[in-house]
Amino acid sequence: MNLMFHQARNNNSFMVAATSNQQHHKTALHVLEDKASGQVYDNQRIIASEQHSYGEYYIDEGKENSIPSESSARDYCGKELNKMASVTKESYVGGRLVDEDEDDYDDEGDREVYEDDITFDDDDDDENDDDDSDVKMNLRTNVNKLRFDSGFEYTLPTSSPENMTSFNPMSDSSHLFSDYSKHNSTILANGKSGTSYLTSTPRRIYDNTNMINIPEETKNIPTCYNGNNHVPSESIFDNPLSSGANRRMTSPGHKIQPSTCSDMLFTLLAKDNKIEAEIPKCTGCEHRIFDRFILKVQDKPWHSQGLKCNDCSAQLSEKCFSRGNLVFCKDDFFKRFGTKCTACGHGIPPTEVIRRAQDNVYHLEGFCCFLCHEKMGTGDQFYLLEDNRLVCKKDYEQAKSRDADIENGVKRPRTTITAKQLETLKSAYNQSPKPARHVREQLSSETGLDMRVVQVWFQNRRAKEKRIKRDTGRQRWGHFFSRNQLPSGPTSPISAPVTTGQKKRSNTKCGNRLIHCKDNQQNSQSHSSPLDGSPVFPIGSIGTGMQGEIGASFQSGCAVGIEGTSDLPSVMDPKNLPPYSETLMSYTEANPSHFVHGQNPSDVTYMNTLPVGGSHVPLTAVPQHNISAFSLPFHMEGNMVPDPSTQFMMATGHLGSQDTDLVSNSSGRSNFSDLSASPGSWLGELEHVQPF
């Protein structure tokens, strides 16, 4: 018997073939042993041989000789394979350990194989015997299925004329699996031992369609296709390097659907940690690289088809740019990491023409004024602001001029009106404060002023009249108001008590008079306003008219309001006057909070108004038909403080000189009738203003 031990140069796996030549009896036994695990699959009969993707693989054929039995060959092969697991870069040929450089041992005689030893017995001298000659088989995928007692399935390749096959070191890993087929293309039933089969040398072969030809009788065998190779399903194992849900584990006798042929190959190779460490890992996907070609970028390996631009996914073949573990094409690299345009912030390729402003770089299209968006060319003067924005010279000077005017307080030119023009406008205003359009046009032509100027003058004049009227009323009635309490003096302070409870009071209307009275027991309580419930202090009833005199009437605990002139004797009757009191004082201009003069209750002229210049003018009895009085309550929430310098109405009821001047100066005509004797006409205008 001739034992052929074929070893890959990378010392990963071994294949042992034992053949016997007897009369009408030939036996083939193929065993695949894995070096890393040390396990011998001798009961599986035939398993596809393997080879490392970076080494050359040479397989020699030996000669056939007879062996006593199949079991003896199996036992011997098992022992020898266990020894071969630790042998590197050496081969067993004919049962003898030789170096790689030594020629294959070729004994032309017959050999007898025993369990413990190998002896050679030459019993046949015919070298040209068809049964003894070497059979050269090709790698055509004429696959047949054989069944043995163990129940495992295997396939055999067809014959080939070559004796040795050399694989490219950088060939694809899917072509490293060999197939076997029967010599006579027949199918044997299970348990048929003693039938002769011939082994063949595995090699690659491609047909015209670049596909695998599978016989009809073997199409029911689960197979795996990868490239141009056909691999039996029993040789598929889990690949520890592959990721995903397709990873499966199998054992002899358990059929699974294989994932890929690469998984099967590298699962066997990965059992050796040294070999796994030598397989490069792709920098991009971090998977092992088993391609024929490897691309390197800065000494970092990449898949040949995986070197793509990180931004545009363009295939990089000649030149690329890297940053860290990322690779880019030229355009995308400069867009991301190149010089940025100050205006738009985008990257500028090195081939593009740019403009510079100090340390700033701009696109040609982005070098423009940010105000007028006018593109600036070569030789144009521009200004660079603090925020790196560009301004053309024209816009910069205009903006600078406006800023200077604001800082210096320069206002728009104002229209000057002469005295003659002013007299014409005042005369027209006295006739009509709101002239029509045709009147304004006539005034514009007479005065030579613009029509818009005439219109604005009338608007300002009306606003001034309204403002003067409001200010005059505020000065006249403001001394009646103060905050929280009446002014008090050292002699007789008068304070407004806070109302803690509302007492019952009676309202009596006598004719046209409305009298609010309260009980005599409530003299210590202050009155309440009939409008908002705030405490009030009863002051006298004061009336003003063009021909009337000022009259006042005080009554203890009462505020009398007279709307007409009937029943006036009852009001002016001395018995209705308040009793004599030392606390009744008259206001003075210097200190309006003091009542400094005692009054005689029998004299109706004891009350004094506020005189001009601080002198006290006694009141005289007035005719009944000239009295027009009203009730003036004092609100404690008021914030009005009397102004000592204010000129009030004289005792005669006529306006003072200062009031007359204010009215006469407001316009060319007399507006005396517009000034109301009551603050009700202008207090409503101040509701939205904070009290004073």
UniProtKB/Swiss-Prot annotation:
<dbReference type="GO" id="GO:0008270">
    <property type="term" value="F:zinc ion binding"/>
</dbReference>
<feature type="compositionally biased region" description="Polar residues">
    <location>
        <begin position="482"/>
        <end position="501"/>
    </location>
</feature>
<dbReference type="InterPro" id="IPR001356">
    <property type="entry name" value="HD"/>
</dbReference>
<keyword id="KW-0677">Repeat</keyword>
<dbReference type="GO" id="GO:0000981">
    <property type="term" value="F:DNA-binding transcription factor activity, RNA polymerase II-specific"/>
</dbReference>
<dbReference type="InterPro" id="IPR017970">
    <property type="entry name" value="Homeobox_CS"/>
</dbReference>
<dbReference type="InterPro" id="IPR049594">
    <property type="entry name" value="Lhx3/4-like_LIM2"/>
</dbReference>
<keyword id="KW-0217">Developmental protein</keyword>
<dbReference type="Pfam" id="PF00046">
    <property type="entry name" value="Homeodomain"/>
</dbReference>
<feature type="domain" description="LIM zinc-binding 1">
    <location>
        <begin position="280"/>
        <end position="339"/>
    </location>
</feature>
<dbReference type="InterPro" id="IPR050453">
    <property type="entry name" value="LIM_Homeobox_TF"/>
</dbReference>
<keyword id="KW-0371">Homeobox</keyword>
<comment type="function">
    <text>May be involved in the determination of cell lineage of endoderm and notochord cells before gastrulation, and in specification of a distinct group of cells in neural tissue after gastrulation.</text>
</comment>
<protein>
    <recommendedName>
        <fullName>LIM/homeobox protein Lhx3</fullName>
    </recommendedName>
</protein>
<feature type="compositionally biased region" description="Acidic residues">
    <location>
        <begin position="99"/>
        <end position="133"/>
    </location>
</feature>
<dbReference type="InterPro" id="IPR001781">
    <property type="entry name" value="Znf_LIM"/>
</dbReference>
<dbReference type="GO" id="GO:0005634">
    <property type="term" value="C:nucleus"/>
</dbReference>
<dbReference type="InterPro" id="IPR009057">
    <property type="entry name" value="Homeodomain-like_sf"/>
</dbReference>
<dbReference type="Pfam" id="PF00412">
    <property type="entry name" value="LIM"/>
</dbReference>
<dbReference type="GO" id="GO:0030182">
    <property type="term" value="P:neuron differentiation"/>
</dbReference>
<dbReference type="GO" id="GO:0000977">
    <property type="term" value="F:RNA polymerase II transcription regulatory region sequence-specific DNA binding"/>
</dbReference>
<feature type="region of interest" description="Disordered">
    <location>
        <begin position="93"/>
        <end position="134"/>
    </location>
</feature>
<feature type="DNA-binding region" description="Homeobox">
    <location>
        <begin position="410"/>
        <end position="469"/>
    </location>
</feature>
<keyword id="KW-0862">Zinc</keyword>
<keyword id="KW-0238">DNA-binding</keyword>
<feature type="region of interest" description="Disordered">
    <location>
        <begin position="480"/>
        <end position="509"/>
    </location>
</feature>
<keyword id="KW-0440">LIM domain</keyword>
<feature type="domain" description="LIM zinc-binding 2">
    <location>
        <begin position="340"/>
        <end position="402"/>
    </location>
</feature>
<keyword id="KW-0479">Metal-binding</keyword>
<keyword id="KW-0539">Nucleus</keyword>
